[in-house]
């Protein structure tokens, strides 16, 4: 299965994925989400900054899901895995605060990151504010040229 992860542009995480500094993509939610139970080892995740085309892809080597989180469990996850998630040691406490009310977490371990020829995706039917899309084949939503799906 293929997935598209829409990233917060101001966090500048795509270069960290390419360099290997960010080895885990984490998703934190108050309720179960699109990615829950769908991301598996050997899947592919395509990454794009919000408002930009897809420019990076990576394989999935492992997935861990956590539910029924509280502030203590959130803190344990962030302190254990935050460094591999591209979070600097000086930012760990900020992220503990940011995620303290989240009830679900997915850790997606990335492998073989690479740049791809930039392409846009058609998010119609997925919700305009959606930050994660799971689809059997990326070509179903890949846009080439002026809004023509491949």
Predicted feature descriptions by range:
Residues 13, 30-34, 52-53, 65-150:
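Contiguous surface segments at macromolecular interaction interfaces
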């Amino acid at each position: 299965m293929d997935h598209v992860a829409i990233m917060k542009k101001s966090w500048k995480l795509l270069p960290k994925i390419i360099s290997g500094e960010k080895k885990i993509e984490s998703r934190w939610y108050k309720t179960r989400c699109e990615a829950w139970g769908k991301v598996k080892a050997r899947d592919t995740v395509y990454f794009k900054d919000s408002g930009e085309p897809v420019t990076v892809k990576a394989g999935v080597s492992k997935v861990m899901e956590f539910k029924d989180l509280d502030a203590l469990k959130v803190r344990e996850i962030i302190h254990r895995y935050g460094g591999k998630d591209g979070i600097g040691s000086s930012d760990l406490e900020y992220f503990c605060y940011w995620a303290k009310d989240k009830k679900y977490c997915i850790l997606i371990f990335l492998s073989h990151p690479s740049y791809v020829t930039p392409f846009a995706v058609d998010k119609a039917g997925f919700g305009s504010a959606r930050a994660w899309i799971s689809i059997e084949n990326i070509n179903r939503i890949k846009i080439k040229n002026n809004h023509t799906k491949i």
